[in-house]
Curated annotation (Swiss-Prot):
Catalytic EC class: transferase
Family per similarity comment: Belongs to the IPP transferase family.
Keyword Disulfide bond: no
Organism: Arabidopsis thaliana (Mouse-ear cress)
Tissue: Expressed in roots and in immature seeds with highest expression in the chalazal endosperm.
One of the protein's GO biological processes: cytokinin biosynthetic process
Feature: transit peptide: 1-35
Gene3D superfamilies recorded: Crystal structure of tRNA isopentenylpyrophosphate transferase (bh2366) domain, P-loop containing nucleotide triphosphate hydrolases
Function: Involved in cytokinin biosynthesis. Catalyzes the transfer of an isopentenyl group from dimethylallyl diphosphate (DMAPP) to ATP and ADP.
Annotated GO CC locations: chloroplast
Protein name (Swiss-Prot/TrEMBL): Adenylate isopentenyltransferase 8, chloroplastic
């Protein structure tokens, strides 16, 4: 079977690569309520959760290389190709040869993937990974998609994280939940520095290429990738200073520098808000009966030593996954 991880998605290749072509007809994709069929056993999956920037991707690679794992992306912004710096996608080198699924597979101008579509696509990936004798590892920060994938009874018309909604603890997979948690003050400081590093690593140039004058209308934002943090925040900047008007930053006047700084600060603030929402949603899942193991990664932040991460996060994760995999074995 072709490894989708290595498939480069471009508009000219959509008929070949778009994962939506692997979906069943729409009537079977979005039922009123989807219920898991009775099985004699449940497939085992590891689910890595956490706020943006907490280290989910790092832990997923660490575990996949130790337990013959394959990673299924559950970050809805990273489903799309393009804007790899802005969406903070792991490079091929950083993936350490671990197969990834639903990562950069949709063309950037594709419509937003629904939770029902993700449930179908990710379920298929899990079945294929299990059939190869490997361990499916779900990793990403979109908790509404994780919920849609895992719950036994799924109603696409109900938003699970509204205050009026109760979340079921009935799951259609046997799950090992790992929550990589970092204290809010430490995480926010790290996220601010990460935004600065992303801007220095080509995010601004990437966004300038994205803001082609042909896409200056607001309708294009209905597409999935256009909701990425970094794009709407730079709307005002690029409306005032179109990307074709190239000029070195050292030559900018104060007004242009101010518009740029304002956009970067807005990115930081919206990233903080996203992190808070993600933590709140994980806590709701945990309080609803999901057996989520919290891992405190705070000591490893701000430190350059790999040993601290291994001692505080990785070693405990390995123990938890080992117990999970041997459970129920004779």
């Amino acid at each position: 079977m072709q490894n989708l991880t290595s498939t480069f998605v471009s508009p000219s290749m959509i008929p070949i690569t778009s994962p939506r072509l692997r979906l069943p007809p729409p009537r079977s994709v979005v039922p009123m309520t989807t219920v898991c069929m009775e099985q004699s056993y449940k497939q085992k999956v590891v689910v890595i959760m956490g706020a943006t920037g907490s280290g989910k991707s790092c832990l997923s690679i660490d575990l996949a290389t130790r337990f013959s794992g394959e990673i299924v992306n559950s970050d809805k912004i990273q489903f799309y190709d393009g804007l790899k710096v802005t969406t903070n996608q792991m490079s091929i080198l950083e993936r350490c040869g671990v197969p990834h699924h639903l990562l950069g597979e949709l063309p950037p101008d594709d419509s937003e993937l629904t939770t029902s579509e993700f449930r179908s696509l990710a379920s298929r990936s899990i079945s294929e990974i299990t059939a190869r004798g490997n361990l499916p590892i779900i990793a990403g920060g979109s908790n509404s998609f994780i919920h849609a994938l895992l719950v036994d009874r799924f109603d696409p018309k109900t938003y699970p994280f509204s205050s009026e909604t109760s979340i079921s603890s009935g799951l259609r997979y046997e799950c090992c939940f790992l929550w990589v948690d970092v204290s809010v003050s430490v995480l926010f400081e790290y996220l601010s520095k990460r935004v600065d590093q992303m801007m220095e690593s080509g995010m601004f140039e990437e966004l300038a290429g994205f803001y082609d004058p042909r896409y200056s209308g607001s309708a294009i934002r209905a597409h999935g990738i256009h909701k990425t943090i970094g794009i709407p925040e730079f709307d005002r900047y690029f409306s005032l200073y179109p990307p074709e008007r190239k000029q070195k930053m050292s030559e900018w006047d104060q007004a242009r520098k101010g518009a740029y700084d304002e956009a970067v600060q807005e990115i930081k603030e919206n990233t903080w808000r996203l992190a808070k929402k993600q933590i709140e949603r994980i806590m709701k899942l945990k309080s609803s009966g999901w057996d989520i193991q919290r891992l405190d990664a705070t000591p490893s932040f701000g430190r350059s030593s790999r040993e601290i991460w291994d001692n505080t996060v990785l070693d405990e994760s390995i123990k938890v996954v080992k117990r999970f995999l041997v459970k129920d074995k004779v």
